[in-house]
Regions:
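Long, contiguous binding/interaction regions
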Residues: 2-98
Length: 98
């Protein structure tokens, strides 16, 4: 059974390559209890993730995660919106100009 992100990828087919954008999401995790929900979302969108880096920042008791994406703008926005709705997590997205 396909998840939502995979269904969108299948539906868009060849259009995905033409409309694809490169973006980086900066995610701040202040509530460790929300990590499972975040990881589930990232797994759902795994087809679009180019790379991921997580940094624990013990001094401030938080974690910093950066995600590099190659996906249609709508997919990137949908993922950012879902991540932003998770309690204790904030996200910002930067897009490449090209």
């Amino acid at each position: 059974m396909q998840n939502n992100a995979q269904q969108q990828c299948t539906k868009e087919g060849k259009e995905m390559e033409q409309e694809s954008r490169i973006a980086v999401m900066a995610i701040i995790v202040e509530n460790r209890d929300s990590v499972d929900e975040l990881n589930t979302l990232l797994h759902e969108y795994g087809n679009y993730i180019v790379g991921r880096m997580g940094l624990p920042y013990e001094k401030k008791n938080l974690h910093i995660v950066s995600i590099a994406l190659d996906a249609p703008n709508e997919t990137i926005s949908a993922l950012a919106g879902k991540i932003g709705n998770i309690s204790g997590i904030s996200v910002k997205t930067a897009y490449a100009n090209a």
